[in-house]
UniProtKB/Swiss-Prot annotation:
Known function: Core component of nucleosome. Nucleosomes wrap and compact DNA into chromatin, limiting DNA accessibility to the cellular machineries which require DNA as a template. Histones thereby play a central role in transcription regulation, DNA repair, DNA replication and chromosomal stability. DNA accessibility is regulated via a complex set of post-translational modifications of histones, also called histone code, and nucleosome remodeling.
InterPro entries with a match to the protein in the record: Histone-fold, Histone_H2A, Histone_H2A/H2B/H3, Histone_H2A_C, Histone_H2A_CS
Database matches in Pfam families: Histone, Histone_H2A_C
Lineage: Eukaryota, Discoba, Euglenozoa, Kinetoplastea, Metakinetoplastina
Chief location: nucleus
PANTHER family: HISTONE H2A
GO molecular function per UniProt: DNA binding; protein heterodimerization activity; structural constituent of chromatin
Cellular location(s): Nucleus; Chromosome
SUPFAM superfamilies, A to Z: Histone-fold
Name under which the protein is recorded: Histone H2A.2
Secretion signal, residue range per the UniProt entry: none
Amino acid sequence: MATPRSAKKAARKSGSKSAKCGLIFPVGRVGGMMRRGQYARRIGASGAVYLAAVLEYLTAELLELSVKAAAQSGKKRCRLNPRTVMLAARHDDDIGTLLKNVTLSHSGVVPSVSKAVAKKKGGKKGRATPSA
């Protein structure tokens, strides 16, 4: 005969914390890293779930922006590389401020022309006007 305690255990769903929360990022691993990092004396169970959800959202947002940037490059095949990820992150206002001090390896620099170089001079040179 099953006791109430064993019946509850049998009724419980088995599976990872990520699957129970509907996340892709590993909640258990994030919680372990939070505990090992000693950011606080005590870490609640919902803290790891919340942090994993935030990381998953930011990753999905950056991936979506990167795919759009790679598709706009005009090439036939769309391939993500560190350069397209960096360009997408720098051109977005929110993610750009969040990743302002981050260096992505093998991504190069954001192309920009300084104002001093972009200034045009007053007269047009090179055109000869006919003096008839």
